[in-house]
Amino acid sequence: MAPEENAGTELLLQSLERRFLAARALRSFPWQSLEAKLRDSSDSELLRDILQKHEAVHTEPLDELYEVLAETLMAKESTQGHRSYLLTCCIAQKPSCRWSGSCGGWLPAGSTSGLLKSMWPLPSATQRRASCSPLSYAGLGSDGKWNLVMTRNCFPTKSTWRWQC
């Protein structure tokens, strides 16, 4: 092989090695020039160089990727998780509830809806709507579990004592 041909082959080998070992797509590799070099070469020096360099590395480029994937899949996941729910609710008010103050909160006797708090009904519908704001309350329910209730746009209807949430 001539010195300039040897240098071209060396550059081609380095390019192939870099792309192959970096696990990059080889679409942009100059395959036509590689095929031409292989056809023009009287002996298989180029193939020998490629095989020797490949054998010297002793690993395939994707072996490390498969090892990392296996470690990731075999890792134990935590059983602890968090869930969140958006609940819409409508609470029917009973006359047996105890009210405190002229515009204080209410606490229904013996019910999980005791977690909710609201304002005493105001005289006009516009005042009732203006006084409502998004609120959230948390506490123990009748089952002994913690409950979180979020209310929004709450205002009492005039005659039925139903609270619309």
From Swiss-Prot:
<dbReference type="GO" id="GO:0008168">
    <property type="term" value="F:methyltransferase activity"/>
</dbReference>
<keyword id="KW-0489">Methyltransferase</keyword>
<dbReference type="GO" id="GO:0032259">
    <property type="term" value="P:methylation"/>
</dbReference>
<comment type="similarity">
    <text>Belongs to the class I-like SAM-binding methyltransferase superfamily. EEF2KMT family.</text>
</comment>
<keyword id="KW-0808">Transferase</keyword>
<dbReference type="Pfam" id="PF14904">
    <property type="entry name" value="FAM86"/>
</dbReference>
<keyword id="KW-0949">S-adenosyl-L-methionine</keyword>
<protein>
    <recommendedName>
        <fullName>Putative protein FAM86C2P</fullName>
        <ecNumber>2.1.1.-</ecNumber>
    </recommendedName>
</protein>
<dbReference type="InterPro" id="IPR029426">
    <property type="entry name" value="FAM86_N"/>
</dbReference>
